[in-house]
Amino acid sequence: MNPIVKSFEYGQHTVTLETGVIARQADAAVLASMGDTTVLVTVVGKKEAEAGRDFFPLTVNYQEKTYAAGKIPGGFFKREGRPSEEETLIARLIDRPIRPLFPNGFKNEVQVIITVVSVDPEIEPDIISMIGTSAALAISGIPFNGPLGAARVGYINGEYVLNPTVKQIGASQLNLVVAGTESAVLMVESEAQALPEEVMLGSVVYGHDQQQVVIKAIAEFKAEAGKPTWDWTAPVEDEALVAQIKELAEAGFIEAYQIQVKQERYAQVAVVKAAAKEALLAANPDVDLREVDNLLGSLEKKVVRGRILRGMPRIDGREPDMVRALSVLAGVLPRTHGSALFTRGETQALVTCTLGTERDAQKIDSIMGERTNRFMLHYNFPPYSVGETGMVGSPKRREIGHGKLAWRGINAVMPSAEEFPYSVRVVSEITESNGSSSMASVCGTSLALMDAGVPIKTSVAGIAMGLVKEGDDFVVLSDILGDEDHLGDMDFKVAGTRDGVTALQMDIKIEGITKEIMEIALQQAYGARVHILNVMDQAIGSHRADISDHAPRITTIKINPEKIRDVIGKGGAVIRALTEETGTTIELEDDGTVKIASSNGEATKEAIRRIEEITSEVEVGRIYNGKVIRIVDFGAFVNILPGKDGLVHISQISDERVANVSDHLELNQEVTVKVMEVDRQGRVRLSIKEAQTKEPAAE
């Protein structure tokens, strides 16, 4: 074994890259560490591409092992199962910036596996995973236009912080991840507390500048440990076939893209492609139809991009900065706690909000520790939304990613647990889609939350921006269609309020995206966002004054913390009886806070009355209605409050002499008693004869 190690300082931490010891049969394997957080990254690529393949089969698998945090997995099998939501999101985070760095035409299968083998609870594993992946690809010999750098940027007390710790992120107004090459930013993912556009742009530039140390270190690591580059050359286009296809299809594509309705346009594009293929097959029956499909796609892309760059109207007839027609409806479903239907052009989201108690919150046990998530947002993209058939089942990677982006956009305006003691689940059903469905989910979520009476700080809207760039010419597009996303050079999603940005996601397919272009995109996005917010506020401008009649109402009371055990009872018997008999949900906290949830106001009042009974102190001199629970020779024990019994001595039963207690009292008999004394040991002395006056009894 011949280990090769490269170490360098990066922000507050030391980063170490090591190869040559572990997983030596992979094309490349790097053990990457940042502090005590360590990941093993392996890369394997197939030397030959499958014949006729027309896509690049890159797979990124990110897996967190519980042993990394010194834990044993839960569940019956006691081993790791399918990827968690967090693992899926980090896999996407790694995939997005590396995918565009593989050369065009490269169709060989590549698999990247990142395994977290040690974790420091203060250092998240995502950044070192991205760095380790970049290093492994750099030394693998697989064609890759890297290296790639990655950085997390925080914003604390008006200053940017490089790779903040978990504790620092908690105090930060920004949590942004940026990845890029030496000359270009490729990917941004962020969550922010409504920060101004200039702060967001500054954080991207700061992160890209700081990660140059990573890019330089990986280049040096590659020089020392890199394998020979594969002998691979990009396939050469058949220029004669390209010319034939242009002659057969260009005019048809130009005409088809005059059609503004998506389904009609798609039908006409299909006609143009079918006619071109038919003509080519007639001339040459041996023509490669897969190559023809690829070349038709390239021509289609050039036609659309050329129209935009020449200043012609967009596919649906809009100008570059125009937002599609909006339709906003709140309260569209009668029995949900909150609902909204948000439509922007041919993109539509039906969004619902459900309120629950604290026990409905999501409990997450990851290698970074346990946490509770009171706000959940789930995004569903059924096949009918794009007029197709398909599998319906558990959420795919894309649905998880889009849901998390919408969650980030909204989270900054959510109320605290003290302001609003409910768990909140939002579901966005995409019922129509033609671009920017995740941002439609942000808008719909804001509306549904307000309809449910959730006191969010202000409305939030989201917009997707696009870019078409050739040389020095570029056009920034607002509210992009699905086709513009597919054919363009950038997908730039911005969510925020009137005051600032709450989430920013950017994926760039080309180099040369300058600070100027990002600045224009952010400013154009701000104008579009304000326009959408104005329309949304006309439908519902602030949260409803009260929650839905169908939602559980949570009432909070305080009791003496020492009385919590009395409310719970032996083996939970008391609280179980309380919840079953009143039909409420009751939650207790260590500080004596009691939360009673029910959609029935009378049930809540009854639960409060009984809890107050259980926790109230016995008062000397007060009269109570009680029940005889035990008879002894010297008197009777009477229950006066839940869990509170007292003794009526034989001498205190009547003014007359009592020879036998059973002659005057029987079990379960209701009697009125007066508290005469509570001694130091908490024993209660009662009297029936002293309570014979007309004083009202305590229930």
From Swiss-Prot:
What the entry lists under InterPro entries is as follows: ExoRNase_PH_dom1, ExoRNase_PH_dom2, ExoRNase_PH_dom2_sf, KH_dom, KH_dom_type_1, KH_dom_type_1_sf, NA-bd_OB-fold, PNPase
Query: Does the keyword Hydrolase belong to this entry?
Result: no
Domain named S1 motif: residues: 621-689
The family database entries (Gene3D superfamilies) matched by this protein are listed as: GHMP Kinase, N-terminal domain (3.30.230.70), K Homology domain, type 1 (3.30.1370.10), Nucleic acid-binding proteins (2.40.50.140)
**Residues engaged in binding Mg(2+):** D485, D491
Q: Which GO terms describe its biological process?
A: mRNA catabolic process; RNA catabolic process; RNA processing
EC number(s) per UniProt?
2.7.7.8
**Cofactor section:** Mg(2+)
Catalytic activities: RNA(n+1) + phosphate = RNA(n) + a ribonucleoside 5'-diphosphate
**Where is it chiefly localized?**
cytoplasm
The residues covered by the KH domain are 552-611
Q: Which UniProt keywords apply?
A: Cytoplasm, Magnesium, Metal-binding, Nucleotidyltransferase, RNA-binding, Transferase
Which PROSITE patterns is this protein grouped with?
KH_TYPE_1, S1
Q: Which Pfam families match?
A: KH_1 (PF00013), PNPase (PF03726), RNase_PH (PF01138), RNase_PH_C (PF03725), S1 (PF00575)
Q: Which domain of life is it from?
A: Bacteria
Where is the protein found, in the record's own terms? Cytoplasm
Q: Which GO terms describe its cellular component?
A: cytosol
Q: How does it assemble?
A: Component of the RNA degradosome, which is a multiprotein complex involved in RNA processing and mRNA degradation.
Which PANTHER family does this one have? POLYRIBONUCLEOTIDE NUCLEOTIDYLTRANSFERASE, POLYRIBONUCLEOTIDE NUCLEOTIDYLTRANSFERASE 1, MITOCHONDRIAL
The protein's job, in short, is: Involved in mRNA degradation. Catalyzes the phosphorolysis of single-stranded polyribonucleotides processively in the 3'- to 5'-direction.
Family statement: Belongs to the polyribonucleotide nucleotidyltransferase family.
What this protein is called in its record is Polyribonucleotide nucleotidyltransferase
Species assigned in the record: Shewanella oneidensis (strain ATCC 700550 / JCM 31522 / CIP 106686 / LMG 19005 / NCIMB 14063 / MR-1)
- Organism placement in taxonomy: Bacteria, Pseudomonadati, Pseudomonadota, Gammaproteobacteria, Alteromonadales
